[in-house]
Amino acid sequence: MSVIKRLEERYGEKVQSEVVYNNEHARVLRFYLRAEQEVKPHKSPSSVFITVLKGKLLFLVNDGKSEEILNAGDTVFYNPEELHGFKAIEDSIVEAVITPNPSVNKLNIS
């Protein structure tokens, strides 16, 4: 069992990210975005669940065909190979659960 209690603000001039948890089954990433910073649209070979922990962001949905604003407490789910990305409307923190865990060379978020 692991308990993770920290929710530190780690903003920078670029989107900041950290691996919160990682094993062969799942990867949990936390992203820190200042207003106007974005994670560019990309695809993952895995299912992706993203929860907004703090702030407000604009998310691509419906395989990139539309956008949706999500606030703290909201969650979005993406199927494998579905186009997704997000842009911060205000300083924000999001957590992504990716399952199954893709290999490092397949996860391209830059």
Place the predicted regions along the sequence by residue.
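Ligand-binding loop in jelly-roll beta-barrel domains
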Residues: N71, P80-S103
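A short, N-terminal "cap"/entry segment at the start of jelly-roll beta-barrel domains
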Residues: M1-H25, L60, N71, S110
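Conserved short histidine dyad/triad with adjacent acidic residue
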Residues: R27-S44
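Glycine- and acidic-residue-biased ligand/ion/polar-headgroup-sensing regions
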Residues: S46-L60
